[in-house]
From Swiss-Prot:
Keyword rRNA processing: yes
PANTHER family hit by this protein: RNA N6-ADENOSINE-METHYLTRANSFERASE METTL16 (PTHR13393:SF0), SAM-DEPENDENT METHYLTRANSFERASE (PTHR13393)
Transmembrane feature ranges: none
GO BP: rRNA base methylation
Name the record gives this protein: Ribosomal RNA large subunit methyltransferase F
EC number: 2.1.1.181
Matches recorded under HAMAP family: 23SrRNA_methyltr_F (MF_01848)
Location in or out of the cell: Cytoplasm
GO molecular function: 23S rRNA (adenine(1618)-N(6))-methyltransferase activity
Keywords assigned by UniProt, alphabetized: Cytoplasm, Methyltransferase, rRNA processing, S-adenosyl-L-methionine, Transferase
Family recorded in the similarity comment: Belongs to the methyltransferase superfamily. METTL16/RlmF family.
Primary enzyme class: transferase
Length: 305
């Protein structure tokens, strides 16, 4: 699991993790190092403490983030996959970026300041961290969970490089996405979102159990399940499809406030109905961008007016 094939060309995490570098930068990672079934150095990716330590090491080593932490039972995101979304968004809003660029800010043409809105920033604040450190973008991150907003704000204030570059806003109405967050005269070059894709806690738990059982090659019980992510991060009424329908509907009211609207779509079966909805919404253009991470394929749905 240490190998991540077919990530974006500018993704710093292509190939295998350099555990020698990572443990030197963050020594607490050492106690989680194991040899996997192939005899190579790795960690137990089913151990949330190990994954959290790996994230801290990656953020220190590759992004210069000296402080990063999340509350217990909150989502601990895989950084390589999150970075891919940012790099593909960069291709969308900065089409002059060369495929030979290394991912360093100095290698990326950036003649003006790009401003981004992360819907559901989470306690981890990972998209703004990567977007700011890689491309110099500024961010507004919104969330309906006060604990997530407070934790993300602490991450920002504890890292001087992020200060005044990332703003956090609490969404006080869980039924709304852009309303109450985007001010009338405000403009964003792009919006990002990793929506909750399950429609209930039970569905979320069952989905995770199936995934872990498949990966481990044996049945995993709920007693063994370490369920990373709270309710707001993992499920909402109507699931991913209903959430994105609401986003598309609301985006019409903010067509002059945003250059591109984007979201991850985890369930391929939702794409047909979502694109049909977009075509009936008088948009100028929509795109489906595929991202490949080993055997996993995920998709970004993007549209503009």
């Amino acid at each position: 699991m240490a190998e991540r094939n077919e990530l974006h060309k500018r993704n710093r995490h292509n190939g295998q993790y350099d555990f020698s570098r990572l443990t030197e930068e963050y020594p607490p990672l050492k106690k989680f190092i194991v040899l996997n079934a192939y005899g190579t150095t790795s960690i137990d990716f089913f151990n949330p403490r190990a994954v959290k330590a790996l994230n801290k090491a990656l953020l220190i080593s590759y992004y210069g983030i000296r402080y990063w932490d999340i509350p217990k039972n909150y989502l601990c995101p895989p950084i390589p996959g999150r970075a891919d979304y940012i790099h593909y968004i960069a291709d969308l809003i900065q089409p002059d970026i060369s495929d030979e660029s290394t991912g360093l800010k100095t290698a990326v043409p950036n003649t003006r300041q790009y401003r981004c809105l992360d819907i559901g920033v989470g306690a981890n604040c990972i998209y703004p961290i990567i977007g700011q450190t890689e491309y110099g973008w500024t961010f507004v991150g919104s969330d309906i969970d006060p604990v997530s907003i407070d934790n993300a704000r602490k991450i920002v204030t504890c890292n001087p490089a992020l200060a005044h570059k990332i703003e956090l806003r609490l969404q006080r109405d869980s039924r709304k996405i852009f309303e109450g967050i985007i001010a009338p005269n405000e403009y964003f070059d792009v919006t990002l979102c990793n929506p909750p894709f399950h429609s209930s806690k039970e569905e979320a738990e069952d989905g995770t159990l199936r995934k872990l059982s498949s990966l481990k090659g044996k049945k995993v019980t709920k007693a063994q399940l370490n369920f990373g992510g709270n309710a707001n991060e993992l499920w909402c009424e109507g699931g991913e499809f209903r959430f994105l329908l609401t986003m598309i509907e609301e985006s019409r009211n903010y067509r002059k406030n945003c250059g591109w609207f984007t979201s991850l779509v985890s369930k391929e079966k939702n794409l047909g109905k979502l694109t049909a909805k977009l075509k009936s919404t008088d948009i100028a253009e929509h795109r489906i961008i595929e991202m490949h991470q080993g055997t996993k394929t995920s998709r970004i749905l993007a549209w503009r007016f």
